[in-house]
Every structure is written in C-alpha cells, then in structure tokens.
Amino acid sequence: LPSHTAVDHTAVLPGLDNAVGGHDKLFHANGLTDITDYNDRMQCTTGKMGGLPDVNTENPDFQYYYLQYVNDLINLGARGFRYDTAKHIGLPSDPLDPRAERNNFWDVATGREAVKGLSLLMPDSLYIYGEVLQDRNVKEKEYAGYMDLVASSYGHALRSALNAGSYN
C-alpha cells in the first residue's frame, strides 16, 4: 500500500524516513489532516484517509525506495500487483501538492518512466489492477490508462439485485 502509513506515523522505521529525506518529506503537505470532503480531489489524493497518514507518492526519493521494493518482489517471482485505495494517489491531471513537482507516481509505478535511473522490471509482463471505487470525483478513464480497475459499482448493483430477487 504505497499511499498510506499506519495510523501511528511515528512508528515508521528510520530507514524509510532516511530514504525519503526525512519524516517531514514522507507525507503530503496535508497528509496528516483528515479528508473532510471526498469529492475534493486535492483532499482525496493528499489527505489522511480513515486515520491513515497520506504518503507523498510524488517524492522521487519515495518512488525510488518503493520501486526498489517492487523490483525485489518481481525478482522473487511476483507477476502482478493490486493497488488498494488507488484513487487516493494522484493522476497527472490532479491538483498538485505543494511538496510535489508533478503527479507522476503511476508513470513510475507502471514502468512508463524511470526515477533516479531506476525502472520497473518487466512492466509488459505484469498484471496490475487497482481499487478505484466509483464515485463523483473519480477519474476512472485516466486510472484505466495505467491499470485494470475493480468494478465496485457493478458488484454493488449485482448484490442489490440478488438480495432483492430482481433478475431483470
């Protein structure tokens, strides 16, 4: 889950803090502030969700650290990745956090772009999908350009129909 840390962000290991340039650079500018409006893309992609502090996924040092981890998993045999809460990581068209130069996490994480000379291993051989719950502020088409998506609206509609006994 690259987008958030545990509720107790002070328990983050020093190695991660050091890798990203310090604890203050690990989070978005409002990454320790609760999201109050999930229809606001800036809050949704940079704010604290459900008590979980929001990681500055646009920080190149974090991207490098994360990509090293993912490449280690690939070297161990992983051939696919599911991104939980993917809609909480910004897209290139989203508002830019004050601590970021650009929203390029998905370009790096899916192998379209290198970070600090490091690229995703075997990007064309991986299956990548993300939890992007459909809602008013979600840019499903843009996320779908990077990964397959969980069809949350379809699942909800199907469960509702089955529970109601309505099969039309």
What spans do the regions from the language model cover?
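Compositionally biased, intrinsically disordered low-complexity regions
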Residues: 17, 23-24, 33, 49, ...
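N-terminal small/glycine-rich loop or linker at the start of catalytic domains
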Residues: 33-55
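Aromatic- and acidic-residue-enriched segments that line the glycan-binding/catalytic groove
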Residues: 2-40, 96-102, 144-149
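Generic detector of intrinsically disordered, low-complexity, polar/charged segments
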Residues: 12, 18-19, 28, 44, ...
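Active-site-proximal helices and loops of the catalytic beta/alpha 8
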Residues: 3, 68-168
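Surface-exposed charge patches in extracellular/virion surface proteins
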Residues: 23-28, 40-42, 48, 75, ...
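Generic structural motif recognizing short loop/turn segments at the entrances and edges of beta-strands
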Residues: 23, 51-53, 124-125, 145
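An active-site-proximal structural segment forming one wall of the substrate-binding cleft
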Residues: 2-26, 55-81, 117
